[in-house]
Amino acid sequence: MGSLTLVLVAVDAPMARAWRTLTEGRTGLVVHEGSITDVDTDAVVSPANSFGLMGGGIDAVYARWFPGISDRVRAGSGGELPVGEAVIVPTGVERPAWLVSAPTMRSPGERLPPDGAAARAAARAVLRLWRDGTLPDGVRVRDAVHTIALPGLGTGVGGLAPDVCAGQVGAAWDEVLGEA
């Protein structure tokens, strides 16, 4: 299996601290402080809603960066992608070539429960897609995607605390790739 570098993106100090704690004792995780648009990566993660509507938070950034991406996400998911599942679609630009949609909420604007279960489900879906999924041309995702930039999952619109998000992403990493 190929190796994955997961770039944990923090736009503020609390998220950066939480991500740094997560990287302790784990290889393959690096922290980037700043905009996700500055990360040189193969794929970015959209912690969108199940309907692929991309009008708020990081998804609004993606909608401006990758024209038509919301339509591609909806087409790739059949119109609704449940929390805990992920789909990978082309961005239409050279880098990052791919966007992974992994919803943290069903409907736009939902506040997430404080336990962070949705962040864990989304992170697990991203990592399983990388480990087991295929691109539209049949190439295994893990053979084509070596870096994925991950923003806080549910920490913006969803209102999840950064430390809870980081803990849940770490649990998903250990569960899915801990033996990789």
Regions found by a protein language model. Name each.
Residues M1-A180:
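Macrodomain-like recognition of ADP-ribose-binding/processing modules
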